[in-house]
């Protein structure tokens, strides 16, 4: 719906980026007792600094930027983001570091909103048990969506068995959106993996460390106007808003002067790379 970025802090008025850092003072759809905007203050924040890093020896180029967010009697942090590319790879290295500039603790929540395009008849593979206890569909309806009459019946089906959503069947009712919370497992290197395998053998991929992002959300949106797939959103909290997530124990307390970091890999895999990753995912799942 958007031809180019829009200069606004409103989340839904500048939408469609491949990767959006969400948080930090709030996250998700605000509940009735919340005051934060949808997905917090970070998504469209006006970064004060930006730079390029080029390493010819390593064959890498990175774009970096920093944003300082200060609210008197409340919050004072520095967020430093970076996106790196390496020659010969179609994967991006995405990182964020959040430094609490206060002397006192800071509450924070984070989610990496990485948006791929759903591919008709693509298949989802990821390091988690494929059952309703580990792949939990959201049954509440946030204020920013208006579901169709058959929506809740589809949600009830997925609540019993999440397997039908693994294939990107264009007939499935992902309109306007379906959201899951997933208990991801790490491999021997401490990494969780998720991918959308394309019919041609290539795949979209995202990988992260659950010790940095212990919560994982999946988002699927397939409408006549918008088509998006969050294969796996690395996060520290689910998306029910600050008050609800605080009650779940999902709000981090970052000590004064401390820094929180996350490192994510995302992008496109060749067919041989995708086949190898599928084997790694199966090995983790089969334990």
Regions found by a protein language model. Give the residues of each.
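Surface-exposed acidic/polar loop and edge beta-strand patches at domain peripheries
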Residues: 1-87, 91-93, 104-107, 114-287
